[in-house]
Every structure is written in structure tokens, then in C-alpha cells.
């Protein structure tokens, strides 16, 4: 069960009592997340008029880009800023220029040179320590660790230029 930090009293006490009264099992775990803040550190709120409409962002950039930003850049437990400028920076550096370039390079080499990987090579077994972050709901920490590896791979490909050596 997730709740905002301003709602912990209700979720951890009153809601649990309501569940018990309805003979429904209590929550075993309550994950308390921070606020998403806007310009000036003000908490985003529809009722206060301090939020962006995520549908507008999804229409312009795609829902996956918005999901990427929210999972990678928004801290699971602390307040995190969201501005259109910060979103655009993350979109351009992370998706368009980062993973976009890396995916293009790797897929081109894999297709042109018939690179095949085994199921074991494609598994997440190398990330057993990082997967613990997911078990503790620290999603952005998990993604940032994997993102660091992807960035390292992209830098390695740029530096060694394996596509030139295969020709």
C-alpha cells in the first residue's frame, strides 16, 4: 500500500481499523512516498493549481517518456522537483541521446554481424544486489544503477568503436 507523507496517520491507523471492521486483512506494509514539487519547491496539487497535466506531457513526449522520468528522477521516499525544463533535460540526455543512441548502435551491430546472446547472458542475474532496491521500493535507485551501467556501455562503445573493427 502506498500513501503520501501527509496521509500516514489515516493510512496506518484509521484505514487499518476500517479494514478490520470490514473483516478484511490489514496492510502488511505501507510505503510512504515524498511529494512531487514544482517550481520553488511548492508541493504539486491539483486543488492548489500547482501541477502540470500529465496528459499534456504524454501527448507531446509519449507516456513512456513520462514514466521514465517519474521512475528514474523522482525519489521514492523524499520530495522531488518536477519542472518541464528538468523533464526535457532528462528526456534529451537520457532517452534521445542516451539510450536511443546506445540502442541504435547495439541493434545495428547485432543485426549486421548476427550477434546472438544466450538466455543466461540476457538474464538479470548480474543485478541481484540492485534487485534488493526494488524489494525495498527504492525504484529510482534501482534504475539509476542500471542506467549507470548503460551509460558505461555507451561510453565504451564510443571509445573502442567495435563497429569499425568488425568491418
What does each of the following model-derived ranges do?
Residues 4, 61-62, 138:
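Glycine-centered helix-coil hinge/cap
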Residues 34-122:
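Catalytic adenosine-cofactor/nucleotide-binding cores of aminoacyl-tRNA synthetases and other
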Residues 1-5, 14:
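Active-site cores that bind ATP or allylic diphosphates and position pyrophosphate for catalysis
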Residues 88-122, 126-167:
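Helix-rich, typically C-terminal accessory recognition domains appended to large enzymatic cores
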Residues 19-28, 113:
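Secondary-structure transition/capping motifs at alpha-helix termini
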